[in-house]
């Protein structure tokens, strides 16, 4: 599928299966989300640009590769996106963090924005937007639009699960933003949930209903 990368690493697939199980506890779900987010982050940052730097090892001076340019920005779509942040920040502790408060109205399924806070110089940074679920795509579309309004030009979207409907909507709205996901499920049900899915990621992560 054009513009969509499915990360099919065996560890990702295994952990995702356990997360799908309805009997997986809140603590277990949260731990697995942290673990899988680290693996997903590894893949979404695979092609970051490098530059050479002169360093001194205990034995000699050498030219060695380091990341080029300004630090990354991880943009979390609240609240469930925060579940992906912890593992990603363990891998890239120097990353800046943006928070985009968007929730889906359960009656209209439309996105409602309520909060936005982001680092400066978004135009000079790679921004990786994170949300466990790409369902209708409305929240993600709105979040990316807000980031673009604030200057972001180089954006990637990372999620755990995606529905074909959400992918279609997102790609139509933001064809310049590639999607990275651990799996593409069958469809959305009448309530806008991904099927077979894993339920509401935020509720399962925080033990709420």
UniProtKB/Swiss-Prot annotation:
InterPro entries in alphabetical order: PRibTrfase_dom, PRTase-like, Upp_B, UPRTase/APRTase, Ura_phspho_trans
Reactions this protein catalyses: UMP + diphosphate = 5-phospho-alpha-D-ribose 1-diphosphate + uracil
GO MF assignments: GTP binding; magnesium ion binding; uracil phosphoribosyltransferase activity
Binding site for uracil: 194, 199-201
Coiled-coil residues: none
Pathway, per record: Pyrimidine metabolism; UMP biosynthesis via salvage pathway; UMP from uracil: step 1/1
UniProt enzyme class: transferase
Cofactor(s) needed for function: Mg(2+)
HAMAP family assigned: Upp_B (MF_01218_B)
Protein's name according to its UniProt entry: Uracil phosphoribosyltransferase
Native source organism of the sequence: Agrobacterium fabrum (strain C58 / ATCC 33970) (Agrobacterium tumefaciens (strain C58))
């Amino acid at each position: 599928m054009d513009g969509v990368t499915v990360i099919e690493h065996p560890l990702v697939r295994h952990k995702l299966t356990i997360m799908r199980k309805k009997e997986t506890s809140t603590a277990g779900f949260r731990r697995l989300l942290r673990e899988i987010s680290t693996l997903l982050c590894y893949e979404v940052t695979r092609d970051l640009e490098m530059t050479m730097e002169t360093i001194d090892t205990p034995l000699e001076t050498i030219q060695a590769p380091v990341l080029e340019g300004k630090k990354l920005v991880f943009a979390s779509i609240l609240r469930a996106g925060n579940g992906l942040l912890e593992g990603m920040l363990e891998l890239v502790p120097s990353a800046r963090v943006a928070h985009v408060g968007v929730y889906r109205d359960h009656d209209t399924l439309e996105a409602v924005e309520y909060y936005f806070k982001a680092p400066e110089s978004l135009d000079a940074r790679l921004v990786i937007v994170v949300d466990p679920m790409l369902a209708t795509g409305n929240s993600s579309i709105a979040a990316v639009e807000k980031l673009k309004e604030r200057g972001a030009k180089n954006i990637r979207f990372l999620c755990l699960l995606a529905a074909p409907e959400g992918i279609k909507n997102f790609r139509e709205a933001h064809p310049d933003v590639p999607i990275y996901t651990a799996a593409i499920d069958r469809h959305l049900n009448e309530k806008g949930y991904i099927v077979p899915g894993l339920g509401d990621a935020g509720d399962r992560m925080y033990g709420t209903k």
